[in-house]
Amino acid sequence: MRLVDFLDNSLALSGCQSEASALDADKKGKSDPGVGFYDLDNDHFLSYQEMVNVSIQLAAVLRRKGVKPQDVIATYAPNSVAAYCCIFAISRIGAVWLPLNVKNTLDANLRLIDKAGVSVLFLHESIAEKYPELINHFGEEQTIFLEGQHIAGLAFSSLVQALVPDVGIVDLDSFTDSSTDKNSTVSLLSTGGTTGDSKLAEWSSLTWKTISDIQQQLMPAPDIPSCYLVSAPMSHAAGMASFVPILQGASIIVVDGMVPERLLSIIESYRITHLFLPPTAIYMLLAYENVKRYDYSSLRYFWYAAAPMSVEKLKEAIEIFGPVMVQTYGQAEAPMSCTFLSVEDHLLALETNNPSILRSCGKVAPYVELAILDDEGNQLPKDQEGEIAVKGNLLMKGYCKNPEATAAIRENGWQRTGDIGVMDKDGYLAIVDRKRDMIITGGFNVYPSEIEQLIWGMPAIKDCAVIGVPDDKWGEQVTAIVELKNPDSVPDEQGIIQYCKNKLGSVKAPKQVLFWDELPRSPVGKVLKKEIRKVFWNEPNRNI
């Protein structure tokens, strides 16, 4: 399944034909933005049909530049409708989409460009102005500039009317020969990079078809007109999660950035039904003083993933936003939805006073096989900890141009995730921790996530990370790095240590607590423990 198939199939099924002019005139500022793609930062709307037209014209531009099926084309732009235009054009010609996160460093994105062998770059003018050396590195001839309502210097209105210079009017039939083989690569996604330099996971047509099948089964179209809000980076899960709502005929509301007051206002004003946010962004919403003043009755799926979430903050989110929270577990190598914690699961946890359900990431998703393996590859029974491994058509094809790294995580048909987990008797999977994050102190194995979950529940704590630091006596000393909600408040190191001792015992309790103004985070909001470890460790093998 190509990405453009989500758009084309939706149009064919639902006949979304709303006109931009009518929506621009009648819908702007009102609660219903209409059916299509609405860019709130650039004040522009494209109906589904207009998006098809624009993508056809841009695909023709790419063809003129010599782009062939399976060539790699990157988008380096903030969230925008223009970025969606580029994505669908890339897909329509059968090329491979590589999204680059604007919050990455330039060096990190240049490494991804070089790893992938990018042939054409869609580049936002704001990025070009910030990094003029990028053009010298990549070449102006193979760069297409976009900004706001313009791509390649042309307004959307011109593209809709098929007035691309030297291309002329192009119809959909011109692109029926683009690659649709189930094993053809559709997109490349950078791995988290939280434990080292990012690799590129290849998602095939079959991967995307499976993502679609799973997501439609787990999160069917709502009972009211759908609006999906994209505010977290399109280059990662928030963007990837938007394609099934597109297939279901949802309006896509696009903003760049996660300012709490603005997001909450958009949810109310535009009657948002779906959104995806990482836990760190949800914490910001919950901390906003006026969070309870807005109307969230339109929400059907408030999707969170990408990192563990505090149980206490999750309970608060359910209280404020309603019974709409859903969670998935996945990674770039096994994308989006290996497991699913449904709305009903969240409610069951509250009704039965069973916080272990909220600490889990749900049950195994349809079309996915999942097992807990020991170090020798043997499957472990329920309630025993081991490494999570997965099978199924959801998996990536492999790491781009890195067969050795692909082979290293695959064994007897299973793909190892690098995550330690345990499956309970009811089928709920709990992520214990990253295998590499485990602390060995005094001969005991300690998983930081258990300690972090406890500290997160303390009223004064905004966020925390627990790591092992070198210690002559214990080998590694359990250390908590803490962000306070109020940076001006008086830190209580001994209070945190004693609280953890009372709940977890002396082995797992931190031996020291350090208070930082801000934890280092990746562009998608994950705490970068490798950066924290650099402060304490000199051994390069442990800085992962």
Predicted features by range, described:
Residues 5-47:
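AMP-dependent adenylate-forming
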Residues 247, 273-276, 286-355, 369:
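Gly/Ser/Thr-rich phosphate-binding loop
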Residues 104, 121, 267, 275, ...:
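AMP-binding/adenylate-forming catalytic core of the ANL superfamily
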Residues 161-190, 197, 220-227, 366:
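Conserved pre-ATP/AMP-binding loop-to-beta segment of ANL
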Residues 363-367, 376-408, 446:
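Conserved ATP/PPi-binding loop(s) of AMP-dependent carboxylate-activating enzymes
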Residues 45-49, 186-210:
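Conserved AMP-binding A3 loop
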Residues 44, 59-104, 445, 483-484:
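Conserved AMP-binding/adenylate-forming
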Residues 209-227, 235-274, 288:
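Conserved AMP-binding/adenylation subdomain of ANL enzymes
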